[in-house]
């Protein structure tokens, strides 16, 4: 069994360099919620050095709230902003001799695109316009995955090690209790359940079916590195290969 392990990087966390030795894919902030040209260059350089797949992590234009504010923007605006961010990282990657592999939206852009078909379509269209060979990463079973499939993109369905799930397979909003799993044992057990059996227990106790093709590790958690190491070790024990 194989699983991709991804992390959001270039967002100002001191653990970026070490996380790049533990993950197989990096989602690099493109300036709209965090990061700038210099951090993008640095992350790309480290990702290439570690053989990690490089991806763009576009966001709503919301540096003040780290891309976590809901926005209602016209689809054409979202298309242009997404294309702008993807294109910037693609150029930086190409200039360093690398190849950009995937795109994963950030924060509220990701969450809204999981449920809003027009927004999902704008993102998928931007990815396709930039490079039809790019992989589109989105929440398992979401509108974003369906939009990517309509454009003929390769999609990658994502699950979260440290996030609570609702009965419909969506994430518990960060503003609600149960959104974040702080207990390491619980996060490990949830991740293995999703990867091995394709299901997750919701905060209300029901099982939700999920397709786990990539697992997100949040690099900004207090124990992010320790958890990443433990998850890698657990995967190794279970014979699960980590690869993009």
UniProtKB/Swiss-Prot annotation:
Keywords: ATP-binding, Hydrolase, Nucleotide-binding
Molecular function GO labels: 5-oxoprolinase (ATP-hydrolyzing) activity; ATP binding
GO biological process: carbohydrate metabolic process
Domain of life, per lineage: Bacteria
Gene3D superfamilies for the chain: Glycoside hydrolase/deacetylase
EC number: 3.5.2.9
Catalysed reaction, written as an equation: 5-oxo-L-proline + ATP + 2 H2O = L-glutamate + ADP + phosphate + H(+)
SUPFAM superfamilies: Glycoside hydrolase/deacetylase (SSF88713)
Function: Catalyzes the cleavage of 5-oxoproline to form L-glutamate coupled to the hydrolysis of ATP to ADP and inorganic phosphate.
Subunit: Forms a complex composed of PxpA, PxpB and PxpC.
PANTHER family: 5-OXOPROLINASE SUBUNIT A, UNCHARACTERIZED PROTEIN YBGL-RELATED
Family: Belongs to the LamB/PxpA family.
Protein name: 5-oxoprolinase subunit A
Organism, as annotated: Escherichia coli O1:K1 / APEC
């Amino acid at each position: 069994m194989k699983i991709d392990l991804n992390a959001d990087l270039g967002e100002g966390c001191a653990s970026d360099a070490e996380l790049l030795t533990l993950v197989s894919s990096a989602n690099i902030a493109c300036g709209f919620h965090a990061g700038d040209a210099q951090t993008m260059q640095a992350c790309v350089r480290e990702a290439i050095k570690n053989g990690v797949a490089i991806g763009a992590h576009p966001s709503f234009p919301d540096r003040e709230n780290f891309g976590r504010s809901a926005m209602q923007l016209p689809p054409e605006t979202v298309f242009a902003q997404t294309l702008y961010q993807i294109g910037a990282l693609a150029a930086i990657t190409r200039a360093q001799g690398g190849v950009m592999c995937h795109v994963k939206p950030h924060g509220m852009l990701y969450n809204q695109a999981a449920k809003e078909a027009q927004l999902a379509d704008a993102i998928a269209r931007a990815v396709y316009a930039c490079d039809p060979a790019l992989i589109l990463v989105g929440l398992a079973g979401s509108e974003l995955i369906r939009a990517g499939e309509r454009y003929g993109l390769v999609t990658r369905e994502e699950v979260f090690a440290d996030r609570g799930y609702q009965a419909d397979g969506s994430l518990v909003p960060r503003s609600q209790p149960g959104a974040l799993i702080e207990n390491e044992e619980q996060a490990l057990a949830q991740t293995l359940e999703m990867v091995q059996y394709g299901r997750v227990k919701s905060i209300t106790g029901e099982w939700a079916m999920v397709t786990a093709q990539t697992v997100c590790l949040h690099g900004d958690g207090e124990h992010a590195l320790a958890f990443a190491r433990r998850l890698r070790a657990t995967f190794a024990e279970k014979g699960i290969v980590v690869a993009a």
